[in-house]
Amino acid sequence: MPKRLVLALLMLLLCLSVGLASPSDVFPLSHSAHQQLSTLYLSQGLALPSTALPYTRAELTFLLSRINIEDLSLVENQIYELLAEEATREMPAFSIGSEISYETYIHSNTNDFTTEDDWVYSYQQRKPLLTVPIEISLGAVTGAIDFTLVSRNVGDADSIALLYGKRNLSSNIPYDFSTGEQYLDSNIPYRAFLASGGANWVVQVGRDRLSWGPGVSGNFVIGDQLQYHNMARLSTYKDSFKYSFLVSFFPHPNEIYDTSLPDSQARPITGLKMFMAHRFEWRLFSDRVNLVLSEGIMYQDGGGNLDLRIVNPMMLYHNYYLRSQANSLASLELDYTFQKGLNIYTQFAVDELAFGGTEWNLESGRHPNGLAIMLGGRMEKPLRNGVLRGHLEGVYTDPYLYLRSLDGNTSQSNDSADSLNYVVGLRKWYSDHIEYDQTYLGYRYGGDAIVLSTSLGYYIPNSWYIRGRFFGMLHGEKSVENPWKLDDIEPAPSGITSTYVQLGVSAGTFLGAWNVYGSFDFLSTANNADYDFDFQLVFGATYSWE
């Protein structure tokens, strides 16, 4: 059958797909469709597709409709067919899948590299031993729940069952055969939600991972490093415009830091901490430019009350003027594909901006800025049977980005609960106590950082890939635990600077239902006169069936 006829039939099937497949089926954030669609857009000379992830089947169908099927190379056509098949897949009303993975982690320095932050291959990247995804697909209503057998993210650093630690060899099996102890994470599921939607909209409520932005090393408003959001979101799109609205809930600082509360399961939920944001995306200049404006607030109430006047999907949140209860954050994103396969992008975020003659002329009590900027370029070039891909990205973040005292006008006390910031926690139960796994909501490395990252790789769809990468970072003294101080206006990196360098390569191959992969990395850290390094090796294999 001629190529054009095949592609025409595929396009017709896409047009009918919303009536066949469940339009509100939500892809996991890690699904390959997100990366493959970006590859197809850039190689065709289009700006990046929407960077508010994840997509639904209906949105994937909508985004594929922009592709000119008459102008596809052999490898582009292969990617298009894979995406079209995914977009039009009709799911049964109830389905259960399974994925079993075995991973081995080997490293050389067992004294200085014993936490998650000391590994290139992070906890979020590491696969559970077993994943059992359950999906319901009932037309306009869908749902998902993922049951996993996975090692917990804390524990005895001497155990082989821990994902990183003081042994040269560890694995993703949540059991220590030498001691008989199990390290199973009992806080699952981390993905569980209901969704409802149509051809150009979706509403999703529950737990899921999210990402807003084009960055590779991270994003400023919502980073993909957070294990899940307890959230509700709306996404709707038409022609060249997309609108998103999100509310996501986290433990209040009083709940986290109140030492009078029990550490057991009886520890009550106290207070309210809610992130609320909206996002506006425009595609301009014949689909070659994306312009995105995002604005959000972190709203807190120690009594756990929510004033419904706050919940307005179209409000200008900066104009609430609730400094003692809300901390606002705004961002601008822009990307431009200036020729086929080559794209440049930027992000700019404002958490705190001290401006005006009154502020600048103060002898004391000056507010530190909380700004962030990212500049990057991306390449997706078809080459023979595959795609040559790479990126180059630089990031600067102010020392106090994401941090602030409760009232925002006086320096933070030594009480960690005296804060209204963008450090968020996930409540978890580990054996005999409650812990709060805290990280930044936005950029994974937070403030006080200068980052340079780059990569170059080659990918053949459904066959194999290889990728080399470099990452360098200068990080100052400020972290999630630092109090916010007036008059501390030093630029990044502040104080004693830590230097991080990573250099590595990863590769993998797809063999039917099997995926075999591995990586080798060199990681070094330097702080004052201290210098440490580690060699890290990862091997893994995954078998999936539906």
Question: What is the meaning of each model-derived region?
Answer:
Residues T114-T115, A161-Y175, T358, N482-P493, ...:
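Flexible, solvent-exposed loop segments that connect beta-strands
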